[in-house]
Structures are given as structure tokens and as C-alpha cells.
Amino acid sequence: MAKNLSAIKRIKTSERNRLINRKYKSVVKTLTKRCLMNIENLENSNLNDVQLSISQVYSKIDKAIKKGAFHPNTGARKKARLARIFAYAQKQQN
């Protein structure tokens, strides 16, 4: 265990940040899974629901990037993959 006061503070701070980052990552994973389930069950009637869920995932990813839980490239990659899956599902439906 650290004896230096600044080191003790850094341990507390890093633990707090770890928990916050974990929360952001968990929310993004959960919303992404929900969105992928909506995309799998894509029909003309629930196209708006799918687009709404995608926008919610995008919003949470952007917030996670802003707070530092995700690197900007990681967020961009997650959004691009989601968009590619959605576009492919739309193409298969038509």
C-alpha cells in the first residue's frame, strides 16, 4: 500500500474513474446488444424503433468518448460497425 499522500489520492482517484468508466462501457454494451436484436427483427413497421435505438447507442458512445471512457477511434469503430450492420440488414430486407 502506498504511504505517500499523493499516491494514496491517485489510488482513490483511479479506482473512482475505473468504476465510472466501467459503467459507461456496460451501458454501451447493453444498448448495442438491444440495438442488434432490433436490427435482427427488422421489419418495415419497426424501422423507426431501430433508428431510435441506433441514435441512443450513438449518443451513449459519444458521451463515453467525451468523458474519456473510450478512445475516439474506439467510439468511431463501434458506431461504424453498427451502421454497417444496419445498412446490410436494410439491404437484405429490400
From Swiss-Prot:
InterPro entries: Ribosomal_bS20, Ribosomal_bS20_sf
Record's signal peptide: none
A single BP term in Gene Ontology: translation
One annotated GO molecular function: structural constituent of ribosome
Listed Pfam families: Ribosomal_S20p
Main subcellular location of this protein, as a coarse class: plastid
Keywords: Chloroplast, Plastid, Ribonucleoprotein, Ribosomal protein, RNA-binding, rRNA-binding
GO CC terms in record: chloroplast; small ribosomal subunit
Cellular location(s): Plastid, Chloroplast
HAMAP family given in the database record: Ribosomal_bS20
Its biological purpose: Binds directly to 16S ribosomal RNA.
Family statement drawn from the similarity comment of this UniProt entry: Belongs to the bacterial ribosomal protein bS20 family.
Protein name in the entry: Small ribosomal subunit protein bS20c
Gene name, Swiss-Prot/TrEMBL: rps20
